[in-house]
Amino acid sequence: TASNSLQKQSGNYFENKFNYLIDFDYRNQKFQTSEGFRLNFGQGIPIYSDEYALKNTFSLDKWIKFDNEVVTNFTFYGQIINSLNDEDVRITDRLGLPRKKLRGFKFGKIGPVDNGDYVGGNYATAMNFNSTLPMLLPSIEALDIRYFFDIGNVWGIDYSDTIDDSNKIRTSTGVALDWLTPVGPLSFSFAQDLSKADTDKTETFQFNLGTTF
């Protein structure tokens, strides 16, 4: 059963937003990137809505290639959403982390929990470290195998003072495989969580088809 605070948000509402993204993409190539960086910033700005909330998104990716063909990649990702008129941010606008930003955890199953419902947070952030393992299956050119270490957090509750805001650092590590096939890019990951909140739900294996690079 939803809490009284969530039940107050039920029903129809009107929302009109302007979304934009500024993207600086200086990668040497989109798949199997080995050098360069990518930086982007976006906003969701309410134009005319029943409730006004501003969302900001920032991400930074940097790739470095070493002489031994090892490619390391560091990423930072952050999102913030806050009300502009002292109203609660709607449950449909609250934040979570994309699946590839925190591997080893079930999508949408971390962060604040209200009466058993995962309601997302006002803040979401993640950092990722990846390093290729070129000594594994080097004969397959369209295949990347990499070690990864992920750090992430989803927290913040604006509609209740009695719910744990879930400000807890989550971490995981494992091995990921990206493979460009005739049917499209495939992505696999095997992960183990290292730290988590008691309410978080984890998963060891993840698979994605048609990942955007």
Predicted regions and their residues:
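Outer-membrane beta-barrel "beta-signal"
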Residues: N19, L177-T181, T202-F213
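C-terminal outer-membrane beta-barrel translocator/porin domains of Gram-negative envelope proteins
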Residues: A2-L143, Y147-I151, W155-I157, T199
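A short, acidic, flexible beta-alpha connecting loop/helix-capping segment that sits on the rim
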Residues: A191-K196
